[in-house]
């Protein structure tokens, strides 16, 4: 516990909150254009080919974004909506592509958790 004299000498430093998704510039989502669509492998205990895309955002940043769900139609020059949210086993991937908006179609034959994958209600 500091004395009052010590607090006068040097005041308490305010805690600085750093954003986990700086490329969005405090917006909930950002539009961007895919510059490269490819697959990558996850960190040690896991094994897969994760679908990711390099996206140039309207904020000027170029980020790596994860493409969720099974199957996608994205290619170079596709216009996508990017939201925050990291992928734990892919280092450097701190953004997700929103399915079912702009050029990204929703996941086919999805019955549960449809809203997260832009899937329409089955008839």
UniProtKB/Swiss-Prot annotation:
The family database entries (PANTHER family) matched by this protein are listed as: 30S RIBOSOMAL PROTEIN S12 FAMILY MEMBER
Q: Which residues form a coiled coil?
A: none
- Record-annotated membrane-spanning stretches: none
Give the species.
Answer: Chaetosphaeridium globosum (Charophycean green alga)
Q: Which GO terms describe its molecular function?
A: rRNA binding; structural constituent of ribosome
**What does this protein do, in the record's words?**
With S4 and S5 plays an important role in translational accuracy. Located at the interface of the 30S and 50S subunits.
- Where in or outside the cell is it found? Plastid, Chloroplast
The record's comment on protein family reads: Belongs to the universal ribosomal protein uS12 family.
CDD domains attached to this UniProt entry: Ribosomal_S12
Q: What is the protein named?
A: Small ribosomal subunit protein uS12c
Keyword Metal-binding listed = no
The alphabetical list of record keywords is: Chloroplast, Plastid, Ribonucleoprotein, Ribosomal protein, RNA-binding, rRNA-binding
Cellular compartments per GO CC:
chloroplast; small ribosomal subunit
Q: Which domain of life is it from?
A: Eukaryota
* Gene Ontology biological process terms, A to Z: translation
Q: What is its main location?
A: plastid
Is Acetylation included in the keywords of this UniProt record?
Answer: no
Description of how the protein assembles with itself and partners: Part of the 30S ribosomal subunit.
Q: Could you tell me which InterPro entries the record lists for this protein?
A: NA-bd_OB-fold, Ribosomal_uS12, Ribosomal_uS12_bac
């Amino acid at each position: 516990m500091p004395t009052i004299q010590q607090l006068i000498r040097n005041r308490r430093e305010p805690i600085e909150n750093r954003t986990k998704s700086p490329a969005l510039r405090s917006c909930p989502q950002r539009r961007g254009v895919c510059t490269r669509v490819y697959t990558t492998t996850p960190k040690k205990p896991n094994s897969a080919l994760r679908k990711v895309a390099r996206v140039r955002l309207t904020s000027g940043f170029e980020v790596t974004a994860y493409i969720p769900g099974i199957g996608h139609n994205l290619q170079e020059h596709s216009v996508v909506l990017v939201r925050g949210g990291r992928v734990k086993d892919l280092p450097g991937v701190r953004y997700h592509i929103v399915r079912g908006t702009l050029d990204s179609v929703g996941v086919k034959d999805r019955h549960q958790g449809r809203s997260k994958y832009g899937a329409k209600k089955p008839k």
